[in-house]
Swiss-Prot record:
GO terms for biological process: GDP-mannose biosynthetic process. Pfam families: GMPPB_C, NTP_transferase. The gene is MPG1. Its main location: cytoplasm. InterPro entries: GMPPB_C, GMPPB_N, Hexapep_transf_CS, Mannose-1P_guanyltransferase, NTP_transferase_dom, Nucleotide-diphossugar_trans. This is Mannose-1-phosphate guanyltransferase 1. Involved in cell wall synthesis where it is required for glycosylation. Involved in cell cycle progression through cell-size checkpoint. One of its GO terms (molecular function) is mannose-1-phosphate guanylyltransferase (GTP) activity. It comes from Candida glabrata (strain ATCC 2001 / BCRC 20586 / JCM 3761 / NBRC 0622 / NRRL Y-65 / CBS 138). Belongs to the transferase hexapeptide repeat family. Pathway: Nucleotide-sugar biosynthesis; GDP-alpha-D-mannose biosynthesis; GDP-alpha-D-mannose from alpha-D-mannose 1-phosphate (GTP route): step 1/1. It catalyses: alpha-D-mannose 1-phosphate + GTP + H(+) = GDP-alpha-D-mannose + diphosphate. Keywords: Cell cycle, Cytoplasm, GTP-binding, Nucleotide-binding, Nucleotidyltransferase, Transferase. It comes from the Eukaryota.
Length: 361
């Protein structure tokens, strides 16, 4: 089987992290985001994976060659010279996706969930249509494009309603699909949207179905959602692989700590925290709902909440970071500084308070 991951461009929504590391390699749950997807595809029997990118970061090539060996898959880049939307990349990767008659998976690289690829493939085969969209239920459907089903046929999609004013349903497109190779024939080689141009044709042909996703789902493409997604992910791990979480007298709730990290006995970590390799946490530090990336240090008596601390960064003593603050790579926050919703660019040193949302350049 085959899979296409829509990686896209420069990950601008996740800046400042993506100023130094390509978005697919930013660690989510202490593993590069894209590795969650490659592993799930490989476990479902996928052997050919295409990454649809606008640029081909050389740093990604090396990492992905390692994953090819580890998971026994072939990973190729499909590089767009101009952005091709969400359907154009399928046409561009036609050679790989149509190399046999088996269906192929398509997924958005920002989506983190319990990827149901095996069940999705079985469901797709059983209904015999040309495409299946994974659907997730949401509390506020008025913000999204909502899937409306055919009354007579279970799971057959009748239409999509964009940001409905009145309630028509609560299932939305989760950004994961399985499609038959002939669907590529419906796509032209130009900027095209799979959601607004390709799927309506399949709906008209009565050949597009939806599959309900169990468990959590999150588009983690921006810092606020990256943190919310981390909460959901850790909750899922606590149920399915509790041994991956860290326990201890100074650990509260769901916390994942790399074994190489050093945490002072009087620090308190959690709930909903991920701490990366070679991180140092000082005495009396309090961390909640945050991600601390590798080689960083949080010094004594600082409070860190709803924050992403970038690689090789240092938070001084008696600091307070909150309000979806994001420190880029190699940032220094001096002692006794308050940062509330600051986005601090790489290699910056800050010694003044940031009382409200701001970009520190």
């Amino acid at each position: 089987m085959k899979g296409l991951i829509l990686v896209g461009g420069y990950g601008t929504r996740l800046r400042p992290l993506t100023l130094t590391v390509p978005k697919p390699l930013v660690e989510f749950g202490n593993r590069p985001m894209i590795l969650h997807q490659i592993e799930a595809l490989a476990n479902a029997g996928v052997t050919d994976i295409v990454l649809a990118v606008n640029c081909r970061p050389e740093v990604m090539v090396e990492t992905l060659q390692k994953y090819e060996k580890e998971y026994g898959v072939s990973i190729t880049f499909s590089v767009e010279t101009e952005p091709l939307g969400t359907a154009g990349p399928l046409k561009l990767a036609e050679k790989v996706l149509k190399k046999d008659n088996s269906p192929f998976f398509v997924l958005n690289s920002d989506v983190i969930c319990e990827y149901p690829f095996k069940e999705l493939a079985d469901f797709h085969k059983a209904h015999g249509g040309k495409g299946t969209i994974v659907a997730t239920k949401v509390d506020e459907p008025s913000k999204y494009g909502v899937i409306v089903h055919d009354i007579a046929t279970p799971n057959l999609i009748d239409r999509f309603v964009e940001k409905p004013k009145e309630f028509v349903g609560n299932r939305i497109n989760a950004g994961l699909y399985i499609l038959n190779p002939e669907v590529i024939d419906l796509i032209e080689m130009k900027p095209t949207s799979i959601e607004t141009e390709t799927f309506p044709i399949l709906v008209e042909q009565k050949s597009l179905y939806s599959f309900d996703l169990e468990g959590f789902w999150m588009d983690v493409g921006q810092p606020k959602d990256f943190l919310s997604g981390t909460v959901l992910y850790l909750n899922s791990v606590s149920k399915k692989n509790p041994e991956k979480l860290t326990k201890g007298d100074n650990i509260v709730g769901n916390v994942m700590v790399d074994p190489s990290a050093k945490i002072a006995a009087s620090a308190k970590v959690g709930p909903d925290v991920v701490i990366g390799p070679n991180v140092t946490i000082g005495e009396g530090v309090r961390i909640t709902r945050s991600v601390v990336l590798s080689d960083s240090s949080i010094q004594d008596h600082s409070l860190v909440k709803s924050t992403i601390v970038g690689w090789k960064s240092t938070v001084g003593k008696w600091c307070r970071l909150e309000g979806v603050t994001v420190l880029g790579d190699n940032v220094v926050v001096k002692d006794e500084v308050y940062v509330n919703g600051g986005k601090v660019l790489p290699h910056k040193s800050i010694s003044a308070n940031v009382p409200s949302e701001a970009i520190i350049m």
